[in-house]
Amino acid sequence: MLCPHCHHNGSRVIDSRPAEDGMSIRRRRECVNCGFRFTTFERYEETPLLVVKKDGTREEFNRQKILNGLVRSAEKRPVSMDKLTKIADHVEARVRRLGENEVSSQVIGEFVMNELKPVDEIAYIRFASVYRQFKDVDAFFKEIESMKKEER
C-alpha cells in the first residue's frame, strides 16, 4: 500500500480489528520508509446493486450520493460529519440487507428520512423537500404538520 506521506510502496500492519459496522476491518499501518502511521479500511467486494430511479432508468448504487444529499440538507446545522456518515452507512446496510439486486430510489429516500428525522428535524425537512419534490408551500406545511402530529 502506498504511504500517503512519502508515496513509498511498502507498509506494515501494526493493529487490525473489526470496524464499528462489523462489515469491514480497520488496520493501522506504518510506512517502512518514513515511519508515517495511517489507517486503512478493508471491505469485501459486494455484488453490484442497481437503483431504479423514478423515470425507470437504472444506475449503480452510490453511497456517496446519499452522503452528498445528507451534507446538503444538514448545511449550517449542528450535525457532525461523523453522524452523517453513520446515517449513510446505516442506509447502505439496510438496502443491502434487503437482499435484492435492484432497489427503488423511493425506498432509499424513505430509509434516509427515517434515519435523519430523529437527528435533526430541519435537515429532515430540507431532505424531504427535495426528495418528495413539494409542489407548493401547502405540501411543505402538510409535511411539517404531520411531524407535529407524530410528536404528540
Swiss-Prot record:
InterPro entries: ATP-cone_dom (IPR005144), NrdR-like_N (IPR055173), RNR_NrdR-like (IPR003796). One of its GO terms (biological process) is negative regulation of DNA-templated transcription. Negatively regulates transcription of bacterial ribonucleotide reductase nrd genes and operons by binding to NrdR-boxes. This is Transcriptional repressor NrdR. Belongs to the NrdR family. It comes from Limosilactobacillus fermentum (strain NBRC 3956 / LMG 18251). The gene is nrdR. A zinc finger (unnamed) spans 3-34. Residues 49-139 form the ATP-cone domain. It comes from the Bacteria.
